[in-house]
Amino acid sequence: MISVSRFLSPQFYAIPRSFVKMSASATQTAGEVSMGIKPPSHPTYDLKAVIKLALAEDAGHTGDVTCMATIPFDMEVEAYFLAKEDGIVAGVALADMIFEHVDPSLKVEWMRKDGDYVHKGLKFGKVSGNAHKIVVAERVLLNFMQRMSGIATLTKLMADAASPACILETRKTAPGLRLVDKWAVLIGGGRNHRMGLFDMVMIKDNHISAAGGIVNAVKSVDEYLKQKNLEMDVEVETRTLEEVKEVLEYASGSETRLTRIMLDNMVVPLENGDVDVTMLKDAVELINGRFETEASGNVTLETVHKIGQSGVTFISSGALTHSVKALDISLKIDTELALEVGRRTKRA
C-alpha cells in the first residue's frame, strides 16, 4: 500500500496555527457559502439541482424515519468533522451549499479549507444547530466529501510526481457528477481536460477509423470549424510514431486548427513493473514544440514521474476519477453536549 504522507509536500504538514484554533470569526451560517477554489464552468450543469436530487433520493417520500423516532424535533446539537485517514480535504464549499439547502440557520465552522492537508484523527470542522437537519444532511455531504477528497488526494500525489508536466483527468467521471469530480481535481492541484463533447474537438480512434485515416479526420475538423466559424482547441490521438509523422506532415502544408497531439499508449509497461518511455520521448522530439503534447495510457502513481520527465506538456489519467478510493471522513455528534441539551429540554 502506498503511503499518502510519502508523497505529500512538506508544506502540507506546516499548517498555520490560525487554521488550527477555532475562532468566532471563522463561524458562518450555512447561508454564507465561502468558496475558495471555484468549480469549473459548465453551460448546463446545475450544482444546486444535483444537491437537491442527492437529498431527495436519500429522504424518499417519508423522510428520515429513524431520526424522527429517536431524536426530539427541537433538539440542538454540535457535530464535528473527523478525518479518519491522511489526505487532502475537498468538498468543504460543497458541504456549505448542502447545509444551506437543508437549513440556512445551521452554524458551520471550518479549520481547514478545500485543498488543505488533514491527518488521521483531526477534527477539521464543526456544525451546530437542529439535530434533525444535521443528520439529514450527514450522509449526502459525506458521500460528496469522501469522493472529492479521494480524488483530490490522488491528484495531489500525481501532480507532484508528474512535474513539470501537468496532470489532467478525463471524461471518465461518475454519471451526473462530472463537474463535482473535475472540481475535486482542481482542488488537488490538477488541471481540467475538456468538460464534455462541446468545448473541445478531440479526434480519437473511432473518429479516425470512420474518417478513413488520421489526416482525413484532422482535415475534416479544420474544414468544419472554418465553415461554422468556430474557435476551439483541437486535439488528435496518435498511437504510433508513423501517425505522429502523418499529422506533422499535414500541418506543415496546411492551415490547421490543431493545438495538441495525444500520444496514446506510447508508455510501454515492462515485466519488472517499470515502463519504457523511449517511444514517448521520440514522439516529443518529432513534434519539437510545434504542438502541445499529452501522454495517455499506463499512467499510474508509480509511473507518472518517469512519464513527466519525458518532455510532454500534459499527462491524462482516467484513474483520477473512475476508480478512486474515497477518503474516510465522518461527522460525529458531540455526545456530551447533546446529553446536556437533552437534559435542559427534559427529553434525554
Curated annotation (Swiss-Prot):
It comes from the Eukaryota. GO terms for molecular function: nicotinate-nucleotide diphosphorylase (carboxylating) activity. Substrate binds at residues 139, 170-172, 194, 204, 237, 264, 296-298, 317-319. Keywords: Chloroplast, Glycosyltransferase, Plastid, Pyridine nucleotide biosynthesis, Transferase, Transit peptide. One of its GO terms (cellular component) is chloroplast. Its main location: plastid. Signal peptide: none annotated. Disruption phenotype: Embryonic lethality when homozygous. Gene3D superfamilies: Aldolase class I, Quinolinate phosphoribosyl transferase, N-terminal domain. Residues 1-41 form a transit peptide. Pathway: Cofactor biosynthesis; NAD(+) biosynthesis; nicotinate D-ribonucleotide from quinolinate: step 1/1. The keyword Membrane does not apply. One of its GO terms (biological process) is NAD biosynthetic process. It catalyses: nicotinate beta-D-ribonucleotide + CO2 + diphosphate = quinolinate + 5-phospho-alpha-D-ribose 1-diphosphate + 2 H(+). PANTHER family: NICOTINATE-NUCLEOTIDE PYROPHOSPHORYLASE [CARBOXYLATING] (PTHR32179:SF3). Accumulation of NAD by over-expression of the bacterial nadC gene in Arabidopsis stimulates plant resistance probably via salicylic acid (SA)-dependent signaling. Involved in the biosynthesis of NAD(+). Catalyzes the conversion of quinolate to nicotinate to nicotinate beta-D-ribonucleotide. Belongs to the NadC/ModD family. NCBIfam families: nadC. This is Nicotinate-nucleotide pyrophosphorylase [carboxylating], chloroplastic. It comes from Arabidopsis thaliana.
